[in-house]
Amino acid sequence: MTDPSTSSRTGHASLPESPFIDRLGAQLLSAADGVSEVVLPLQRDHMNTWDVAHGGVTMTLADVALAMAARSLAGDGVGVVTVEMKVNFMQPGRGELRATGRVLHRSTTMAYCEGEIRDSEGHFVAKALGTFKYMRRLAVGRDITRQRLRSDPAAKPGPSD
């Protein structure tokens, strides 16, 4: 995801541009003050072999909701990346999935979040916990070496690189 727009942090629904999330069809209803709500009307492409929401779709929706809750507390130009996430699946999701996210605790660099997903009947589909790191958008892949300043350009990357 890219940096959040001003409108998403002031309560107007707008997800940051992300080709994967755009294709999924998730819609941000709100994200402000550490709380978010995201919906996904399930389509045939979202289903598993039993004709219910695929677990990966459910996990992605949880990730988006938790990340948007965390991002709603960030300043301009700051986004989040998922450090870890755990999802417990309670029952199959059908119809429209609605995910809520909430920041439990925020430090200078991290946000600890929780969320839940319910279906259009109000059934409890999943519970999620996640940790997110605040950061400015960085170059990735091959471009990252241009971003880092090393005293020895031939030095091998360390464990945190």
Residue ranges and their predicted role:
Residues 1-161:
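Terminal targeting signals and extreme-terminal segments of soluble enzymes
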